[in-house]
């Protein structure tokens, strides 16, 4: 890790990230040193939603889960037809509804983002996005981004007693990530 991280601020990268749940969006929004484009919630397609793997594996749960989004979309349409204003209709979204975002972020903030968001302790959805972003960064410039990944890969784990205990496995995984 360089002591001259300010040089990383000169490099910026823009990502279009599709199918980000509203729940995951809060994790992206916590990174203040970025320019993030979020579409109006009034334009969100209420039929689009994330499907967690654990729910997808259980047919009954999957059916009930998808039905909740369908019913919410129906309620939205009923409220809209009843004249409820668009701004209030944003409240008829579920945290699993998805939208597409665009973010521009510099190399220094990306280092912090990857340390936090590619960690096994990160929320699963943002971790998947972070790993996909890291693959693209390594394609663009592997000489710099081969050093990016979770804290345990970059230096040492910062999770203290909450550590996953898999630092060696993570060093191998992120060391071989392409």
Regions inferred by a protein language model and the residue ranges of each:
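A conserved ligand/cofactor-binding region detector
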Residues: 1-178
């Amino acid at each position: 890790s360089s002591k001259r991280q300010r040089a990383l601020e000169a490099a910026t990268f823009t990502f279009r990230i599709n199918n980000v749940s509203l729940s995951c969006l809060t994790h992206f929004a916590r990174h203040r040193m970025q320019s993030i484009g979020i579409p109006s919630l009034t334009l969100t397609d209420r039929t689009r939603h994330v499907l967690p793997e654990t729910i997808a594996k259980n047919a009954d749960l999957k059916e009930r889960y998808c039905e909740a989004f369908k019913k919410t979309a129906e309620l939205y349409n009923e409220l809209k037809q009843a004249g409820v204003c668009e701004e209030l209709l944003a409240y008829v979204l579920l945290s699993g509804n998805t939208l597409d975002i665009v973010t521009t972020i510099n190399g220094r903030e990306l280092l912090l983002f990857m340390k936090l968001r590619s960690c096994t302790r990160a929320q699963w959805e943002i971790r998947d996005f972070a790993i996909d972003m890291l693959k693209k960064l390594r394609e663009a410039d592997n000489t710099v981004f081969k050093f990016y990944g979770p804290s345990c890969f970059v230096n040492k784990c910062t999770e203290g007693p909450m550590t996953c205990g898999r630092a060696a496995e993570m060093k191998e995984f992120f060391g071989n990530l392409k």
